[in-house]
């Protein structure tokens, strides 16, 4: 695994919604550190540094969090984001140990092209696995190259990276290859078109008669 990202935090001295809002105005993210017999610690970290970690490493990122001169190995377990700005409002940080295995949700993506005339639908975007805390995969890839209509990929068919193991049910449907539904084309109203044509012809005939009378 690459070098572990370091992040410095500070213990919170004020609590409540008002205190959290003041922290966010000062570009700090309120967070709680818990797990492995550690008494929960309420801290705050720099919002720009934390959001950069999320962008580059995602949720499940593992980092060294320094609090009052002491390092804690933590994993980003969950984040609450503002629905409008997408800024992080709060974070849950799980205290972990080297060599420990943790349950994490990992995205599943597919690559390749199915057989001509077949449509690939993805039924599950994430699966839960058990992985070494320092070797959590960013994603799991499924190759659908050449798959035919009726083919399926279940969670149990996925290749687990490294020493990771599947936690999700093995029969969880991940990929389903189906026949595309034909688009319904609007029906031509032949009777209506005929009536319109007759009306147009009648109008032309009346116009011609009027000109001849003149």
UniProtKB/Swiss-Prot annotation:
Subunit relationships: Part of the 50S ribosomal subunit; part of the 5S rRNA/L5/L18/L25 subcomplex. Contacts the 5S rRNA. Binds to the 5S rRNA independently of L5 and L18.
Protein name (Swiss-Prot/TrEMBL): Large ribosomal subunit protein bL25
Source organism: Corynebacterium jeikeium (strain K411)
Signal peptide range: none
Record keyword rRNA-binding present: yes
InterPro entries in UniProt: Rbsml_bL25/Gln-tRNA_synth_N, Ribosomal_bL25/Gln-tRNA_synth, Ribosomal_bL25_b-dom, Ribosomal_bL25_C, Ribosomal_bL25_long, Ribosomal_L25_dom, Ribosomal_uL5_bac-type
Keyword annotations: Ribonucleoprotein, Ribosomal protein, RNA-binding, rRNA-binding
HAMAP family: Ribosomal_bL25_CTC
GO cellular component: cytosolic large ribosomal subunit
Function: This is one of the proteins that binds to the 5S RNA in the ribosome where it forms part of the central protuberance.
GO biological process, one term: translation
Record has RNA-binding as a keyword: yes
Alphabetical list of Gene3D superfamilies matching this protein: Ribosomal protein L25, beta domain, Ribosomal Protein L25, Chain P
Region (Disordered): 178-214
Example of a GO MF term: 5S rRNA binding
Family membership noted in the UniProt record: Belongs to the bacterial ribosomal protein bL25 family. CTC subfamily.
Acidic residues bias (residue ranges): 179-214
């Amino acid at each position: 695994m690459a070098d572990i990202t370091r992040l410095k935090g500070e213990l919170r001295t004020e609590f409540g919604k008002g205190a959290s809002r003041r922290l966010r105005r000062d570009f700090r993210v309120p967070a709680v550190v818990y797990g492995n017999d550690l008494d929960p610690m309420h801290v705050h970290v720099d919002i720009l540094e934390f959001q950069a970690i999320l962008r580059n490493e995602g949720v499940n990122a593992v980092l060294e969090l320094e609090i009052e001169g002491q390092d804690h190995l933590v994993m980003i377990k969950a984040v609450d984001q503002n629905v409008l700005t997408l800024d992080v409002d709060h974070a849950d940080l799980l205290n972990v140990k080297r060599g420990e295995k943790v349950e994490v949700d990992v995205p599943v993506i597919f690559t390749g092209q199915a057989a001509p005339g077949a449509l690939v639908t993805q039924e599950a975007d994430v699966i839960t696995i058990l992985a070494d805390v320092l070797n959590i995969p960013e994603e799991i890839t499924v190759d659908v190259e050449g798959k035919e209509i009726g083919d399926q990929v279940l969670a149990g068919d996925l290749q687990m990276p490294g020493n990771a193991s599947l936690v999700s049910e093995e029969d969880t449907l991940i990929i389903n290859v189906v026949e595309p539904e034909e688009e319904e084309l609007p029906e031509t109203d032949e009777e209506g078109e005929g009536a319109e044509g007759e009306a147009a012809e009648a109008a032309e005939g009346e116009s011609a008669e009027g000109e001849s009378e003149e």
